[in-house]
A protein has these predicted regions:
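Short, low-complexity disordered leader/linker segments with a strong preference
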Residues: 1-27, 92
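Immediate post-signal peptide segment of exported/extracytoplasmic ligand-binding proteins
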Residues: 19-30, 61-67, 160-166
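Extracytoplasmic "Venus flytrap"
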Residues: 29-50, 73-80, 102, 172-178
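Short, solvent-exposed loop/turn and secondary-structure capping segments
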Residues: 40-43, 83, 110-111, 134-135
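Signal peptide-proximal N-terminal region
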Residues: 47-70
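C-terminal intramolecular chaperone/auto-processing assembly modules
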Residues: 52, 183-190
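Structural motif
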Residues: 66-92, 150-154
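Extracytoplasmic ligand/sensor domains, especially the bilobed periplasmic-binding protein
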Residues: 92-184
Length: 190
């Protein structure tokens, strides 16, 4: 996963002149919910990205000896306006790509309102909404986690393989709950 992330970033950076705006450094954004409902998960996600950036920088072979400077922003996971503002701040600060965001709703808002209009690549490690599969991204949005639609199909198949004839579905009444457990599983199980 780490090598894939580095490879995608390097490929994208090779086509952008903004990558070298401060000499040798390449500014990369990390936007995750450092505050909010998943704040306990995000430090490890950010540290993983920063470690990948460090390894790429320390190799000495990143685009002729360039290094990556990580810049963090808080998506909050829950507040799309705050996440978009944070992402725009990173973009205004010169980042050429963003690792994040994390939660699907805020990821969609950041992609639609900040990253895509500014031509900044996003790679989300955890946004799983099926709607992101068909986002009009002009080639700027990627994710490493599969869509909830696929997860629902797999869960339904496992349930059917175990000869379960009926199920009761409970879920959190928000986009994540509906996508992940309600619609995707329910549609695939029927």
């Amino acid at each position: 996963m780490k090598k894939l992330l580095i490879g995608i970033f390097v490929f994208i950076l090779s086509f952008t002149s903004k990558a070298f705006s401060d000499g040798h450094g390449i500014k990369m954004g990390i936007i995750l919910g450092f505050t909010g409902p998943i704040e306990t998960l995000t430090p490890a996600m950010a540290a993983s990205a920063e470690l990948a950036f460090k390894e790429a920088s320390d190799s000495g072979s990143l685009l002729g000896g360039k290094y990556i400077k990580a810049m963090r922003g808080d998506s909050t996971c829950a507040d799309s306006a705050a996440g978009t503002t944070a992402a725009q701040g990173l973009i205004d600060g010169g980042v050429v790509a963003i690792m994040g965001a994390d939660c699907s709703g805020v990821t969609t808002a950041i992609a639609d309102n900040a990253a895509i209009p500014n031509g900044v690549v996003m790679i989300s490690p955890s946004a799983t909404s099926p709607a992101l599969t068909s986002i009009n991204d002009n080639g700027y949005f990627f994710r490493t986690a599969p869509s909830d639609a696929r997860g629902g199909e797999i869960l339904a198949k496992i349930t059917k393989d175990r000869k379960v004839k009926s199920v009761a579905i409970t879920y959190t009444n928000n986009d994540y709950g509906k996508d992940c457990n309600g619609d995707c599983f329910g549609d695939a199980f029927i």
